[in-house]
Amino acid sequence: MNKTKLRAIQNRQYNAEREAMDTWAKRDLNIEKLTEQVYQSSMQHITDEVDAFYLRYANRNGVSIKEARKRADTMDVTDYFQKAYEAVRDKDFSDEAEEWLRVYNLKMSTSRLELEKAKINLELLKMYSEIENITNEQLEQARLAEIARQTDLIKEYEEQSGILANSVGNPTDRLKGVVNADFYGANFSERIWSRNGHYASLRKELFKSLNNLSVDMMGYRRERNRLMKIFNTSKYESMRLIRTEHQRVNMQVQHEMAVANDFTHYTYVAESGACSICKALAGKTFKIEDYEMGVSAPLMHPACVCSVYHHIEMTYDNGKKTTDDMDIASKDDYI
């Protein structure tokens, strides 16, 4: 291989990664649309519950929530239950009976704060379960697609470089675990369901709004607006996590297959509009043993869609190596 041929191969590799970035961006838009639909549906159900909670507390009795709760709490519960039962049985819907029923319902409402929380909790569980299922399906599709893409790229590289190989190495067992692999100490499922995960964080904020409403109905509009902001923030964070997981899968597949096929180096390819961190790495070539996500390889930050292409170091007839003219860097330079 001569320098001209090597440069042509590298140009094709670079262009292949930039084309892949466009494909990944379209894929991320599709998953974001699905996630948006799930969030919008759940947000509608939950805000409906909050609205109903407010109406049950405030509107039915025409009194302040403090006074309404006081009425319920000072009534003899046993005696009241009997009166309420008799009113329903006898259809005695006088103003007085209706007031009894309203206060009875209010008593159930004050004790139903936990029931409202349970309803919202169930909706959150359904929402995040659906997001997890959709994401895992998309990640598995991304894994298989990247395996196929890398297989084709490796074959092309070997043919163009004159490397004789019977087949492309495929570390099947290692690639199977890519989707559920840890990334900075946690996998996707743990980032959703752990004690400090997305589900627990959003649930905590929603319950806080319910608690606030139960003691201060005058703040209903404020709490409802706060609720909408919380949901939108949570949606953004979930989408960012999904984009990050997608690219993590791509990068891990690339690296595992590069190692299995004896590649010695890789070159960093920054996305268009890359941040200053990624721009500083663009075009840098590292030894394969220096590969470390977040230090010398993508992902350098959440939702990073930069990539790499790989190279096998060879020796020219004149004794020089194919890596001699590359911008070689060390992981230690970026720690």
PLM region descriptions:
Residues 1-138, 227-231, 236-335:
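Activation/maturation switch segments at domain boundaries
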Residues 100-226:
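Structured, charged N-terminal subsegments at the starts of enzyme catalytic cores
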